Amino acid sequence: MAARYALGLPRAAPVGQMGTTLSQRAGSSLEFKDHRSYEPGDDLRHIDWSAYARSDVLTVKLYREEITPHLDLLVDTSRSMNLEGSDKGGAAVALAAFFAAAASRSGYSATPWLLGAECRPLAGGHRPPAQWPPFSFEHRGDVTPNLPLFKARSTRVLISDLFWLGDPLRFIRPFGEGAASATVIQLLAQADVEPPEGQSLRLVDSETDEVKEIHIDAIAAKRYRDNLARHQQFWHDACRQVGAVFLPLIAEDVLAQWNLDALVAAEVLRVR
């Protein structure tokens, strides 16, 4: 079923005749591939003067860099992403592998990144997902907002539960800067969304190991759901400010059904 999907085409870049995505910026590769019409602000060194002499129309040469789209895929490695008794960790890895495979089917190059105290490339991430090393969800505390310099005009996807403190814009601004498209997938376990009402629980903070005994009555459950909805709205608003897509998914539903209609509706994916 997963093979039905390819990455959606970024709205910020037109579709080329070769079936890949063309950036509006001039590339630096020496390998010439195609033309497009001149636009104000284009590098004059890339104008095809021979074509202009023949047609009296200004055109710009496109190079391989401009027609090789790229996916930057960030996976949150916080301890909360591997919630005990849930499928969240497995779903995060499965989604990462799915996006990498969809990128390959779409003619994209891809770089998987591990997000924690720093944002670093996954060792062996250039290989097929089946050959990736195991993911380790061991980071404690907030993830770094100091992101690397991603490839210009890349498609960017973040997979995280977003259980971070602070203003979402502190992360989402550098994440979306210069991207062809940016998508934030909030991956939650069912237990993250619906606390077990009417039960007494022994909770262990995944970040600090602090232990707390609590009873979840109807009032506490409603307070939790309201706080989660407020947190999600903060992230939704931040994403909208920078032109990113925000999508919540439930880990158990992803693994059981692979229903990705929400990603297709948001044009993050397309059906081949």
Regions found by a protein language model. Name each.
Residues M1-Q24, R36-R45, A51, V60-R272:
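Exposed, interaction-prone extracellular/peripheral surfaces
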Residues G27:
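Glycine/proline-rich, flexible active-site/cofactor-binding loop segments
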